Amino acid sequence: FLYIIRDVTKEKLREERLRMEANRDGLTQIGNRHYFLEKAGDMLKEESSLTFCYCDLDHLKYINDQYGHTEGDWYITFFVETIQKHIRKEDVFARIGGDEFCVILYNCPYEMAERKIRKIQKEFSSGQTKEYPKSFSCGIVEVEGGNEELQVRDIIKQADHEMYLQKKEHKKKYRKELSVISISED
């Protein structure tokens, strides 16, 4: 008989590291789109209330163009840190794309999620004084899990639509404020 014994510790550690890298955003270390879609799909199978908060950072392109990508990275990580202070371990938070993020609040009714997002928006915009405005827009959609008809992509699409409505309203308000400032300066 011939026995071969091999230590696979390094291989297992490497596999684990690669798995983590495949599911994490390199800059923020939160989940990435792949991780999010997988977790959201699993959560939708459960019979619980889920509130999807689809967030889009405002002004990121401007910050990158005016102040450089290092400052843009700071802006993103400051946003992530602000969100993380307000979510629970059972909630899911991921970076979906460059300036787009999604939080799934587990068993958190729409009204409570809306209050939470407003609080986060206020904290984010007022924290860490910078030469530029800090804000994000957020679309919120509440769903009941356990419904096999629900698809993550459809929920994201609806939350994204809600987010753009808020962004559009915010821009109108911002333009009105600028108009008032311009008129009063004349």
Where are these regions (language model features)?
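PAS-family sensory domains
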Residues: 1-7, 158
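Short helix/loop segment flanking the catalytic signature motif in cyclic-nucleotide metabolism enzymes
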Residues: 75, 102-119
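Conserved nucleotide-binding and Mg2+-coordinating catalytic segments in signaling enzymes
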Residues: 16-38, 55-69, 77
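A short pre-motif secondary-structure segment
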Residues: 92-95
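PAS-associated C-terminal cap
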Residues: 6-20
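Short regulatory alpha-helical coupling segments
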Residues: 19-20, 33-49, 80-88
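Catalytic-core segments of nucleotide cyclases and related cyclic-nucleotide turnover enzymes
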Residues: 11, 65, 114-121, 125, ...
